[in-house]
Amino acid sequence: MRDVTHDVPALHRRSFLKYTGALGAAAAVSASLSACSSGPQSTNETGGGGGRNRTLTAVIGYGNDGSWDPTQTASAFCMAANNHIYEGLLDTDPISREPYAALATQVPADPSATTWKFTLRAGAKFHDGKPVTADDVVFVFDRILDPKTQTLAKGFFASWLKEVRKIDAQNVELVLKFPFPDGISRLTLAKIMPKHVFSQPGGWEDAIAGKAIGSGPYRQTAHHPKSNTTFEAYPDYNGPRRAAFKKMNWLTIVDAAPRVARISGASAGAQIADNIPYANIGQLEGGGLTVAGGAGMNNLFLMFNTKHKPFDDVRVRQALHYAIDTGKMIEVALKGHGKPASSFLNEANPSYRRAKSVYDHDPDKAKALLKEAGVSGLKIEILAVNVSWIVDCLPTIKASWDAIGIKTTLSPQETTAVFTKMDQKQDYQVVAAASNPNQFGLDADLIMHYNYGPENLWMQYTRWADNSIAKALFKDMDRATREPDAEKKKTIVQDYIDVVAEQAVLYPVVHNELMTAWNPQQLTGIRAQPYPGINLLQAKWA
């Protein structure tokens, strides 16, 4: 089994490459990366001795060959790495998502204001030694807000942020379209990048391919796609999250067995690993490791091609959800570390409300809906990503659909293969994949706009955006974004999620917990995340 990228929305990172004419560039490192690289390094290096100067080795269960462009990426590995390399004006705590001053000197006193002014941290430098200026801030936000440039970050900002103005070399002003307090925590998604580097011809292609020059506590020293990425503490960093490790070596090991082996035993080759298989928790704990989970928006979802009959019929989509034995899936595949979806949002989300349509296992209702829709003799090929826990869940889906008379074929494939087909607009019936918008934040408005919207990439995949119900939904989503009253906004969100649940075009089957393992004798300050990747900005040697 292979874990290519746990967060399939992450997976669609490659889809954005087509907008820059760089599809496929993420598989190779640009030659210009050598300017900030130290050359090949053994993936087996663990520091060459003890002491505080030894290398921290981490095992990441996702590929490092996705887009590294902070304005585009949703790759688990790359986003986690970028959080150590780059800074936003503000950044957020990885668990609570409380904002703190990063490149800016303070958090705005009034989140409800329609202008936010920021002063840049004095003496802040990029990893090439050049100073961070207001021009760099404007450069990044201009890209994000450019109507002619399609980026993932655009969906997080364009609805509420009008423009970003330079006041002088050290000061900028953000002008909002309307009061939007949630925007404060979203500023971490706009990582400030050096204009003098990435405005050059081919600069964004280089960023996609792995070139990373930020102002954060760690400098990227080497990048080997599908192998490892290395870092070292940046000596000129003068911000609030100073590096505790002199060097770091992050290995990408997408196969579950070798990933577990690398962190196991007395001679383990790593101190921390994410994406721990549920079946290995006891083994690792027995070996003295701490294994902890984070529950959030991680989910297995089904996505239907609404232009492929009979999946244009909402009754068919609902029937397929009702048919799935989620209890068995959670018991057998997830070893109890999951819950059936009772809303698009997970139960712990502050905006959660049980949806009006909840797809409890009901094969009789599923059969009745198919009969009502006039569907019989249905044959379905499930196009799935081969993330290991998704692969573990697929047999339950097949058995459940077979049980109501559907001839079901499983077709798990490399993530890139699945979403290349989506980008090429190839025909398909249903996709089973994984998603976790908590990588970007916790607020429901962000989560829902990540998955739904008139220009949203997922909606292009579903071929549903021009549906009259979809158009009404998108208007309600925009109304919620603009609603200044928090409780009214919450109600609007909950009401439109009822529509999302009823239509089941792209909808979760289960929400599941993610597991991280580390050696508590060597590391302290680790907190398990409810989304893929790791954050070591507050960790240190024990």
Features from the language model and the residues they span:
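N-terminal secretory signal peptides
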Residues: 1-15, 22-31
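Gly/Pro-rich hinge or "lid" segments in bacterial periplasmic/extracellular proteins
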Residues: 93-94, 98, 188-243, 247, ...
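Extracytoplasmic/peripheral linker and loop segments enriched in polar/acidic and small residues
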Residues: 407-412, 416-418, 447-520
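Long beta-strand-rich cores associated with HINT superfamily self-processing modules
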Residues: 516-542
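N-terminal lobe/hinge region of extracytoplasmic solute-binding protein
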Residues: 59-111, 142, 213-214
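Surface-exposed binding/hinge segments that line
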Residues: 119, 155-199, 222
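Structural transition elements
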Residues: 335, 339-372, 389-392, 484
